[in-house]
């Protein structure tokens, strides 16, 4: 495989070796095809241009907890994008691979059709009563648009979640995700975010 990979890279191709024990050479027999799908997606033309990340801090607190204490609690608060199998599962698997000796508790608090305002009201019951997250992921953008709350209420909902989280655990790392869906695309094309 090494020779084929080197030759393909020399021709300008992208190669990533994904070891899957017990499935021989048949990719359709993989228990989890996410690494293959992720590789294909990451290597699409203009993929990097479409990635928008605004980093406002770090994930140092949760990293140190996972790496040194070998325990970690990670919560996922969001709508159907969070509830269904997808990004949440990929992050859970990635964390388990990065920190194989860490015992994780994952709080899956995705409920379809809910945005930041409902999240603010359910954060205590659906997340904090199940554990104190070291790392919190919050997703709401698509349902914020469809729930009918104006941008002020959406902002207040998200700020309420963040303030509540910071009040109960100032060391909690927080990642806010804002996915898009079809009605957002014309706005993005016009440069409106």
Residue ranges and their predicted role:
Residues 2-47:
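C-terminal catalytic histidine-bearing segment of alpha/beta-hydrolase fold enzymes
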Residues 3-4, 31, 35, 39, ...:
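Alpha-helical elements of Rossmann-like donor-binding domains used by nucleotide-donor carbohydrate transfer enzymes
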Residues 46-77, 81-104, 129-134, 193:
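N-terminal secretory targeting modules
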Residues 1, 76-79, 140:
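Short glycine-centered, acidic/aromatic-flanked micro-motifs in structured strand/loop junctions
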Residues 24-25, 82-83, 114-115, 143:
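Glycine-/small-residue-rich active-site loops that bind phosphorylated ligands and cofactors
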């Amino acid at each position: 495989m090494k020779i084929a990979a080197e030759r393909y890279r020399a021709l300008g191709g992208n190669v990533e070796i994904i070891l899957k024990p017990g499935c021989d050479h048949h990719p359709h027999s993989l228990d989890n095809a996410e690494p293959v799908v992720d590789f294909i997606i990451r290597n699409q033309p203009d993929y990097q241009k479409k990635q928008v990340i605004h980093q406002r801090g770090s994930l140092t607190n949760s990293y140190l907890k996972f790496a040194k204490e070998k325990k970690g609690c990670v919560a996922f608060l969001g709508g159907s994008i969070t509830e269904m199998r997808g990004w949440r599962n990929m992050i859970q698997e990635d964390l388990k691979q990065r920190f194989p000796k860490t015992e994780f508790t994952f709080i899956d608090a995705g409920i379809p059709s809910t945005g930041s305002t409902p999240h603010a009201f359910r954060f205590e019951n659906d997340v904090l009563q199940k554990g104190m997250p070291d790392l919190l992921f919050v997703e709401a953008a698509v349902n914020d648009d469809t729930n009918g709350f104006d941008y002020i209420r959406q902002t207040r909902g998200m700020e309420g979640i963040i303030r509540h989280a910071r009040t109960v655990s100032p060391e909690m790392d927080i990642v806010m995700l804002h996915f898009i869906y079809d009605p957002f695309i014309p706005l993005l094309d016009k440069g409106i975010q």
